[in-house]
C-alpha cells in the first residue's frame, strides 16, 4: 500500500539517540505551529476629540504659514496694484493677512500656544484614563454600548490583566500548566 498523499505536519527529522532508540526532536517547526500574530491590535479609547482636531488644524496652519512666508508679500503687492472693484473684500483679506503676519512675527507666542495645546492634550489623556479606570463615563462617548455585551466582555478582559494573551497554543501558560500536571 502506498503512502497517503497528505502533507506531513511534523515529518520525522532528527537523529536516533543511542540509549532508548527514540528520535531527538530538532528545532524546526511547521508554519502551522507558529503563532499567527505576536501582538494584539487594540482600539484607541474615546476616538478623535476636539483637542485632536484643533492640534491637527494648528499643525496644518503652521505648515501653510511656513510654506507661504515669501508668497504673502508678493500677494499683497498684487492686490494693491489691482482695480478698486473689491475694496471691501480686499480690506477684509488685508486685515486677516495682518493677523497672520503678527503670528509669523512672534514665534514665541506660537511656541507658547503649542506648549499649551500639548499640556491640555496630555491632561485630557490622563483624565480620560483615570475616568475609564474608575468607571466614569466621559464626554468621549461610551453611551449604551459600554453596557452592552461586548462592552462587558472588554471590561472583563481588562480586569484579567495577569494572564498574557498568546496565539501560539503550545507556548501558552495554560497549555504548559496542563502538560506539567498531566504528563509525567
UniProtKB/Swiss-Prot annotation:
Skewed-composition ranges (Low complexity): 119-133
Stretches with biased composition (Acidic residues): 85-107
Gene assigned in the entry: CWC15
This protein's name: Pre-mRNA-splicing factor CWC15
Subcellular location: Nucleus
Species in which this protein is naturally found: Eremothecium gossypii (strain ATCC 10895 / CBS 109.51 / FGSC 9923 / NRRL Y-1056)
Domain of life (superkingdom): Eukaryota
Keywords: mRNA processing, mRNA splicing, Nucleus, Spliceosome
Record flagged with keyword Oxidoreductase: no
A GO MF label: RNA binding
Compositionally biased spans, kind Basic and acidic residues: 55-66, 108-118, 174-184
Principal localisation: nucleus
Amino acid at each position: 500500500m502506498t503512502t497517503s498523499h497528505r502533507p506531513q505536519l511534523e515529518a520525522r527529522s532528527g537523529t536516533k539517540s543511542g540509549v532508548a532508540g527514540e528520535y531527538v526532536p530538532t528545532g524546526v517547526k511547521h508554519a502551522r505551529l507558529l503563532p499567527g500574530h505576536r501582538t494584539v491590535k487594540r482600539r484607541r479609547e474615546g476616538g478623535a476629540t476636539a483637542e485632536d482636531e484643533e492640534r491637527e488644524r494648528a499643525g496644518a496652519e503652521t505648515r501653510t504659514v511656513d510654506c507661504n512666508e515669501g508668497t504673502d508679500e508678493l500677494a499683497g503687492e498684487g492686490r494693491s496694484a489691482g482695480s478698486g472693484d473689491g475694496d471691501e473684500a480686499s480690506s477684509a483679506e488685508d486685515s486677516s493677512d495682518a493677523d497672520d503676519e503678527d503670528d509669523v512675527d512672534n514665534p514665541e507666542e506660537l511656541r507658547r500656544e503649542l506648549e499649551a495645546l500639548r499640556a491640555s492634550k496630555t491632561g485630557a489623556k490622563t483624565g480620560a484614563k483615570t475616568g475609564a479606570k474608575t468607571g466614569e463615563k466621559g464626554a468621549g462617548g461610551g453611551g449604551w454600548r459600554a453596557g452592552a455585551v461586548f462592552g462587558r466582555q472588554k471590561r472583563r478582559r481588562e480586569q484579567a490583566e495577569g494572564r498574557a494573551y498568546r496565539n501560539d497554543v503550545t507556548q501558552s501558560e495554560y497549555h504548559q500548566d496542563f502538560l506539567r500536571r498531566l504528563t509525567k
